[in-house]
Regions:
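Negatively charged, low-complexity tracts enriched in Asp/Glu with abundant Ser/Thr
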Residues: 24-68
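Intrinsically disordered, low-complexity regulatory segments enriched in Ser/Thr/Pro
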Residues: 80-135
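Ampiphathic alpha-helical segments that act as solvent-exposed interaction surfaces
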Residues: 24-27, 111-165
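Intrinsically disordered, low-complexity coil/linker segments enriched for acidic/polar
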Residues: 10, 46, 50, 75-77, ...
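Amphipathic, interaction-prone secondary-structure segments
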Residues: 50-100
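Short acidic DE-rich linear segments
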Residues: 172-176
């Protein structure tokens, strides 16, 4: 069988689960890059990665972990979120990133519109990944209810409503 003693899973099961987690992480980062950061930038005169914006993100990051920091990338249109965590600590990586994102959402201009194409693509991709992952989730009905609320709210209003706060964070924690 060659089971992993810590997870009690075969090598194939373990690899498949890691691939699913990576896909979900890519989907979240796509949302952060294409929807969330441009949305937050409306508070900073449209300059997405200026010093004031990065300082604001860092202030939010410090609220959830002193191991997290945000810095400018190699060019003015890049940003890096970095964590001083062990390489395989998926739970901490994702939960801290989403806590930081959720906390920072209070700064967003909720009347600004977001790119509808990215919103729909993100929701559909995320739902498809979650469907693949559902077999290992105990409380699946409650889990999908949260994502249904999130998807309906985003597509109906084409902006981030106040009810969006905390949805991702609470739902994501149920994956683990």
């Amino acid at each position: 069988m060659n089971n992993n003693i810590r997870t009690n899973k075969t090598k194939e099961e373990f690899v498949k689960e890691m691939e699913q987690r990576i896909n979900i992480r890519k989907t979240i980062m796509d949302f952060v890059d294409n929807v969330y950061f441009p949305m937050m930038a409306t508070k900073f005169d449209g300059k997405v990665y200026n010093a004031r914006f990065i300082n604001a993100l860092n202030a939010e990051a410090k609220k959830v972990s002193d191991r997290m920091y945000v810095k400018r990338g190699y060019s003015n249109d890049e940003i890096e979120i970095q964590l001083r965590l062990s390489q395989w600590n998926y739970n901490d990586y994702e939960s801290i990133l989403l806590k930081c994102k959720t906390n920072a959402e209070g700064r967003i201009d909720y009347n600004a519109t977001i790119n509808d194409h990215y919103t729909k693509v993100w929701i559909e991709n995320f739902k498809s990944y979650i469907e693949e992952y559902q077999k290992s989730i105990d409380n699946y009905d409650e889990y999908m209810k949260v994502f249904a609320e999130l998807g309906d709210a985003l597509m109906k209003y084409n902006k981030l409503p106040h009810s969006f706060r905390g949805h991702l964070d609470k739902a994501w924690m149920r994956i683990y």
